[in-house]
Amino acid sequence: VVIAKDLTSDVVKKLEKGAKVLWLPTTSSHFVAADDTLSQSDNATPYTVGGLFQTDYWNYRMFKTICENNKKKVSPGTLGILTNPEHPIFKGFPTEMHTNWQWFPIIKESHPLVLDNFAKDYRPVVQVIDNIERNHKLGLVMEWKVGAGKLLICMSDLEKAAKYPEGRAFYESVLGYMQSDEFNPAAEITMDELKKKLAEKPRQVSLKELNNISQY
């Protein structure tokens, strides 16, 4: 398994020729396409969101406005994860379909990727649930066939997460899965398509108002 923080031209060539590549982007910067390399730029618009272990409290818009008015950091605003606990990637990392405490170090070091520009029927291995205001499709772990190779993207700094037993267990489980014959992504994508999707600005949702229609 080739482990990379950037998809350099050398890594891309190995991938397209049949290598298994684990891509671990380490910041929440936007990914920009440059020639045959996917790199990260601090000057580009971030198309990721922050990592948040606990469900965002109560009303994202209200607390977002309060934070902005007080020049405070706004919560990432996400609502936990959604995954298939029977997926072979979890053989060494037991999980439910939702967030639980073993996920804390992984999510704490994460920056989920906005997948709005990808195929509507594509589902990441680990999806992050967004709040109703943004309603982005967010991915923590994604996989594709690329050329003759196989690519797995994890939007968590697993080296930092590995300071904790849970983080190490997840990292080892990911690598064990990738080294096995069970690593066989159903979805396919070309490098050109991947570059284009990552470079496109995601859709923007504009809600005029949120109404409480309950009887409480």
In which residue ranges do the predicted regions lie?
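Surface-exposed beta-strand edges and their flanking turn/coil or helix-capping segments
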Residues: 16-17, 36-37, 104, 141, ...
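Short amphipathic C-terminal alpha-helix that caps PH/PH-like domains
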Residues: 167-179
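Soluble or luminal CAZymes and related metallo-dependent hydrolases
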Residues: 3, 134, 166, 170
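Short, charged/polar low-complexity linear motifs in solvent-exposed/disordered segments
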Residues: 40-41, 108, 169-172
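Catalytic beta-strand/loop cores that center a nucleophilic Ser/Cys/Thr
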Residues: 30, 55-165, 182-216
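Short alpha-beta junction capping motif
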Residues: 2-52, 56-59, 145-155, 174-177
